[in-house]
Amino acid sequence: MKLSDPKLFRQQNYINGAWEAADSGETIDVTNPATGEKLGTVPKAATAETRRAIEAANAAWPAWRAKTAKERAAILRKWFELMMANQDDLGVLMTAEQGKPLAEAKGEVAYAASFIEWFAEEGKRIYGDTIPQHGADKRIVVIKEPVGVVATITPWNFPAAMINAKPVHHLPLAARL
């Protein structure tokens, strides 16, 4: 597998601003499904690493919440731009670890990036709403605000598009980029 920018190929967990191995040092092999060739490894993270990641995200939360919608949008926009600038390499990586045709993998990168772009733009348009009340002496107002650190488990058919996808030991590299 040849990437134009080899720095994109990461084989560690990203926790609290740093790339690190699993505490145990154990890894899981990632192979090309077409050839069986080993592409690399990913850390076999456990409870301690998960807790550190959650704690780091919670510690970063107040600073993120304090940013204006425009500032948050600029960060998300930069992420979108980086994905699109590296679309070819990300497509090569997905093709190697999933067996998808290269054109489909590159399309998935653009599809994944489009979600980030959408949230960057919509985040600037978050307004509170007034909802019709059931009584003359009531006013119901909706205030939209960040709520905190969340996690989700989603299907793994589109690893770049489903950034929070559940880990599967055959396809973890594309979601780390």
Named regions from a protein language model:
Residues 17, 36, 72, 116, ...:
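Residue-level signature of catalytic and energy-coupling elements of molecular machines
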Residues 1-34:
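Hydrophobic face of amphipathic alpha-helices that form TPR/SEL1-like repeat modules
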Residues 32, 44, 144:
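Conserved strand-loop elements at the edges of beta-sheets that form or border functional pockets
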Residues 13, 21, 95, 124, ...:
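Short glycine- and Lys/Arg-enriched binding-loop motifs that mark or flank ligand-binding interfaces
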